[in-house]
Every structure is written in structure tokens, then in C-alpha cells.
Amino acid sequence: MMCILSEDTIPRTQIEKRKTSLYFSSKYNKEVLSPPRRKAFKKWTPPRSPFNLVQETLFHDPWKLLIATIFLNRTSGKMAIPVLWEFLEKYPSAEVARAADWRDVSELLKPLGLYDLRAKTIIKFSDEYLTKQWRYPIELHGIGKYGNDSYRIFCINEWKQVHPEDHKLNKYHDWLWENHEKLSLS
């Protein structure tokens, strides 16, 4: 025999409990918003090169480094880097970026082209960066080989295992191989 329950037959406390999703509870938000603990927190300072790549400055904050790779995708550094610094001033963390209105982010990105797509990508990426269990950033929305290689080279000291395809990353990677003994890199 099947029993159909209506709101009248369910105790009021059960109905009230359902109205509050875990998503909105402060306990859930605190846990979700803390950055994932990963290899990125091992001590590794990539050496400064003659190429002065933006990754050499942002290695200490993987989210910012990965945001830079989104900015640099199909855009010259000369155009992207000034807008990147402006973006990071307004949106200094994944928590702030994931809560942003994509239209505001899009307006900031207009000089770079693909601004609506990039804005939505940045917001979704920032959310996944905080909430998804990931090992490498290529698992996150908007991050491809370039972003993944940058993370592995500059954030977690896996430069020996990486074979970059980007010309600037290749220059840095080749420079590391040429100088790793002199720089005492393992």
C-alpha cells in the first residue's frame, strides 16, 4: 500500500528544515570558501629569469597566476597585463571574483576582446577553484594546457615534467634547464 504525504501529514519541523539549504548555512560557506590545500603550498620559489614573465611575480598565489593565464589567452602581454593588474585590484581573490556580476567584469575586460566570454569564464573558474576537488588546474573551467603548465612550473616545482607549447613558457623552461645546476634546482 502506497501512502502519499502532503504538507499536512509531514511534521512542521521537517518542512522548516528543508527550507534551509546547506548551501546557505554559514558552516557550509566557510568550508567552501577556504582555498583547497594542495601541492601549491609546498615551498618553491621559481627563479627570476631575464624574460620577466608575469608568472614569476604571481607564483605565490595560484588563483592569480591562473587568472593571468586566462587574460593572456589569445592576447598579447602588452595589452593583457595592465588590465590584469586593474582586475586584481578590484577582484583580489577567488571569493570576490566568484561573487562578481559578469557584466561588471566584462566592462573591465573590454580592451582585451572576448570580454563577455572571459568574464563568465573567470567567474565560473573562480567558483570551481574554491569548490571543486582538483589536483591540477586543467580540471577547472577555462584552464587549458598553458594555464596548467604555468601552474606546474611556477607553483609546484614540476617544471621537469612539463613540455610547454607556449613560446614564452618554452623560453623560461629552456632557461631553467640550461641554468638548473647553477641555480641549485632539484
What function would you assign to each model-found segment?
Residues 1-59, 171-186:
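Intrinsically disordered, low-complexity, charged terminal extensions of DNA damage-control enzymes
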